[in-house]
Swiss-Prot record:
GO terms for molecular function: mRNA 5'-UTR binding. This is Translational regulator CsrA. It holds the Pfam family CsrA. Keywords: Bacterial flagellum biogenesis, Cytoplasm, Repressor, RNA-binding, Translation regulation. Homodimer; the beta-strands of each monomer intercalate to form a hydrophobic core, while the alpha-helices form wings that extend away from the core. It comes from the Bacteria. Belongs to the CsrA/RsmA family. The lineage of its organism: Bacteria, Pseudomonadati, Thermodesulfobacteriota, Desulfovibrionia, Desulfovibrionales. A translational regulator that binds mRNA to regulate translation initiation and/or mRNA stability. Usually binds in the 5'-UTR at or near the Shine-Dalgarno sequence preventing ribosome-binding, thus repressing translation. Its main target seems to be the major flagellin gene, while its function is anatagonized by FliW. PANTHER family: CARBON STORAGE REGULATOR. Its main location: cytoplasm. It is found in: Cytoplasm. One of its GO terms (biological process) is mRNA catabolic process. GO terms for cellular component: cytosol.
């Protein structure tokens, strides 16, 4: 993990197209501003983890459904 120190008003770039600016700090919270291309999706970590888990469950369900359908199809061919 790369650790950087920035003050309010200072920025950093990720590649050429993503700029992150420290807007302010209050207590234990840091307010960040992100300038990203329109085709770039930005998620908070907890939301991203939820999306990944939901996608995993959906894929698992799809695979299970496919296996059941294949078994039923195989039984009808007998």
């Amino acid at each position: 993990m790369l650790i950087l120190t920035r003050r309010p008003g200072e920025s950093l770039y990720l590649g050429e197209n993503i700029r992150i600016t420290v807007l302010g700090m209050q207590g234990k919270q840091v307010k960040l501003g992100l300038e990203v291309p329109g085709d770039t999706t930005v998620y908070r970590e907890e939301v991203y983890k939820r999306v990944v888990e939901e996608n995993r469950r959906a894929l698992e369900t799809s695979n299970n459904d496919l296996m059941v359908a294949a078994e039923l199809w195989h039984e009808t061919k007998k």
